[in-house]
Amino acid sequence: MRKVGLLLTAVLLLAVFSAGCISSSSENANTSEKETTLIVFHAGSLSIPFQGLENEFSAYAEKNLGLKVKFQDEASGSVMAVRKVTDLHRKADIVATADYTLIPQMLVPNYTDFYVLFATNEIVIAFTEESKYADEMKAHPEKWYEILARDDVSFGFSDPNQDPCGYRSVMVMKLADLYYGKPIFETLVEKNTNIYANGTHIYAPKEIQVKNNRIVIRPKETDLTGLVESGSLDYFFIYKSVAEQHNLSYITLPDEINLKDFSKADYYGQVEITLGSTGKTIKAKPIVYGVTVLKDAPNRELAIEFLKFLLGEEGKKVFMENHQDFLNPPVAFGNVPEEIKGLVEVRELTLGQP
């Protein structure tokens, strides 16, 4: 009888253990089913605010949606972010660019049917205390183009073919010609690179070449940040938000050239640039960021939830904390999803509008 009792006990223990394993496996399966990924291609200048926003959204989704959300996050120049979709045919849920016009020009109608304008910025010249003539630059910011033209000074901007900050930087220097009445573009750009201008129309060859070691060009604007911080580069053209996020010194430029002032849109529009990489011509205009969810987004429903989060109070808070101005309200065009209509001003596209 004792043997029978021991055998019965062993069988019961085995049954309990097996049930526990099955239950645990089932729970693990359910947990894994609740894990999901959002793929985001975004401008380099959005890296810090998007990192904060994604962390906030992950916590929100786990608490309110019962989902563990991971982000496959790729920062690049905005032109490259778009071309990952159009040229490389890569899948993504969300594309966010530093120039909203890239979305209607390159993604509508084949890849998306709506877009939202949500944030602004301005071009500044950033540096550190170790940059050559830093004290003079701070004391006399109006001499910025004279300081950059000195033979012992190095400066940089991002590749116009890959990054809006790059084509905006060279357009700023062409606008400076008009504002100051001096050949600043020729001195700073044409003498140092193969980028050239015919009047106020700038041409950026597909393969950008530099003619000396005074100028540095990188795929996206944030690639230059480390060079300035390490002392390898004296100055660079960058967005104000990025300069502040990295605690860099910087000078602001007149509103006539910094691409910040919406009331000066017509003045900015005197200058345009043709990109060798795409063949497209872009007019200078106030800096406005854009975002969209792609038609074939692998996780479209959740991507719309993230977009709602970005455009809501949480997104505004994160952007303000990272020194970037948010449009109030954001402006949406196209076939705007019902879920975000309460957070945006919906406008109709007009003839000739990008």
Swiss-Prot record:
<feature type="binding site">
    <location>
        <position position="221"/>
    </location>
    <ligand>
        <name>tungstate</name>
    </ligand>
</feature>
<comment type="function">
    <text>Part of the ABC transporter complex WtpABC involved in molybdate/tungstate import. Binds tungstate and molybdate.</text>
</comment>
<dbReference type="GO" id="GO:1901359">
    <property type="term" value="F:tungstate binding"/>
</dbReference>
<feature type="binding site">
    <location>
        <position position="78"/>
    </location>
    <ligand>
        <name>molybdate</name>
    </ligand>
</feature>
<feature type="binding site">
    <location>
        <position position="78"/>
    </location>
    <ligand>
        <name>tungstate</name>
    </ligand>
</feature>
<keyword id="KW-0472">Membrane</keyword>
<keyword id="KW-0813">Transport</keyword>
<dbReference type="GO" id="GO:0046872">
    <property type="term" value="F:metal ion binding"/>
</dbReference>
<feature type="binding site">
    <location>
        <begin position="163"/>
        <end position="165"/>
    </location>
    <ligand>
        <name>molybdate</name>
    </ligand>
</feature>
<feature type="binding site">
    <location>
        <position position="221"/>
    </location>
    <ligand>
        <name>molybdate</name>
    </ligand>
</feature>
<feature type="binding site">
    <location>
        <begin position="163"/>
        <end position="165"/>
    </location>
    <ligand>
        <name>tungstate</name>
    </ligand>
</feature>
<keyword id="KW-1003">Cell membrane</keyword>
<keyword id="KW-0732">Signal</keyword>
<feature type="signal peptide">
    <location>
        <begin position="1"/>
        <end position="23"/>
    </location>
</feature>
<comment type="similarity">
    <text>Belongs to the bacterial solute-binding protein 1 family. WtpA subfamily.</text>
</comment>
<dbReference type="GO" id="GO:0005886">
    <property type="term" value="C:plasma membrane"/>
</dbReference>
<feature type="binding site">
    <location>
        <begin position="44"/>
        <end position="45"/>
    </location>
    <ligand>
        <name>tungstate</name>
    </ligand>
</feature>
<feature type="binding site">
    <location>
        <position position="239"/>
    </location>
    <ligand>
        <name>molybdate</name>
    </ligand>
</feature>
<keyword id="KW-0479">Metal-binding</keyword>
<comment type="subunit">
    <text>The complex is composed of two ATP-binding proteins (WtpC), two transmembrane proteins (WtpB) and a solute-binding protein (WtpA).</text>
</comment>
<keyword id="KW-0500">Molybdenum</keyword>
<dbReference type="GO" id="GO:0030973">
    <property type="term" value="F:molybdate ion binding"/>
</dbReference>
<dbReference type="GO" id="GO:0015689">
    <property type="term" value="P:molybdate ion transport"/>
</dbReference>
<feature type="binding site">
    <location>
        <position position="239"/>
    </location>
    <ligand>
        <name>tungstate</name>
    </ligand>
</feature>
<protein>
    <recommendedName>
        <fullName>Molybdate/tungstate-binding protein WtpA</fullName>
    </recommendedName>
</protein>
<dbReference type="Pfam" id="PF13531">
    <property type="entry name" value="SBP_bac_11"/>
</dbReference>
<dbReference type="InterPro" id="IPR022498">
    <property type="entry name" value="ABC_trnspt_W-bd_WtpA"/>
</dbReference>
<feature type="binding site">
    <location>
        <begin position="44"/>
        <end position="45"/>
    </location>
    <ligand>
        <name>molybdate</name>
    </ligand>
</feature>
<dbReference type="InterPro" id="IPR050682">
    <property type="entry name" value="ModA/WtpA"/>
</dbReference>
